[in-house]
Amino acid sequence: MEKRVFLIVLDSFGIGAEPDAAAFGDEGTNTLGAIAKHPNFNCPNLQKLGLFNIDGVTAGEKTAAPTGSFARLQEQSMGKDTTIGHWEIAGVVSPKPLPTFPEGFPAELIHEFEEKTGHKVLCNKPYSGTQVLKDYGEQAMKENALIVYTSADSVFQVAANEELVPVHELYRYCEIAREMLKGEYGVGRVIARPFLGRTADTFYRTTNRHDLSLKPPRATMLDLLKNAGKDVIAVGKIFDIFDGEGVTEKIKTTGNTNGIAFTKALQTRDFEGLAFVNLVDFDMLYGHRRDVAGYAAAAAEFDRFLADFILGMREGDLLMITADHGCDPSYTKTTDHTREYVPYLVCGKGVKPGVDLGTKLCFGTIAQTICEYLGVDASSLDGHSVWNEIKA
């Protein structure tokens, strides 16, 4: 029997503040709680799997007979960003946060970047990705400059207009930055942020974003699976997050709708191993932009896909749904990620329905469970498998 695991990360789909949320400035945040109240939120299939039965979830209506097993996962890494969240899902806890730059990057580093790219740098401070285009986009076009900005996350973001700086050139500049940003300046991600438009009112970010991540500090679930001869198919920004480490095939997507379509297509393919999917729009388009209505509608779109996907699952298939952090669209103190628990939903013909796993410490629960199911030794990874508790 072919064993396939479909692990889908709903990027930023948090389910309530973690105990240490106040230390991150995120006390009382709840992404699911915010969107579940909105009329656009219609998620009967997530409900059936047991989303609202998860420990501590007060939103929505519990189902009497969940079709999946479910848990609440608590992050052990000292961070709330995409890179650290995904590394922990893959079994690597980060005890120290990646460096952030609330005052902007050091002047000498920016000067070196200007020298190496031949472009002046504008901004160099934490900024909203859409607001930075309004405030600096026109000047960047006049001066053929690059807009460099950061956020509360460990990121070095470079924005440029595609008409002046071709996408391949922007990617090259980001590779230069990635080479420079090591050690104490070793941010989690360097992100190319191409945009189009001519004026502050018409600028918009294109889908040609590209992330250059730090390499994980040690082998992750992806490496272990690949080394064991399994397929590791990265859909969406998974390849970028792991800097390609442990990936056997990558599929680039342009957003949730496209990512969902690729995932559905993968279901018809023969492979043995892991399809690791990231659906980024929840975070990028709706969480950071504090768009509750858009987030709720995106959840409903994913839920519609679930019905067909579950029907099409084969004998040896497992479906796992989780998140990497929160990004509460109703939280107005910041536009950053929020420190939240994440859901863990598992279903398949080989999974017992309705197993309430309570709260588990460490997103690495996922890596351990996947490795045990696929018969791969995961003793080097963080977390504990729950496979024996949920197998039918």
Positions of PLM-derived features:
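Feature captures the catalytic ectodomains and active-site-proximal regions of enzymes
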Residues: 1-392
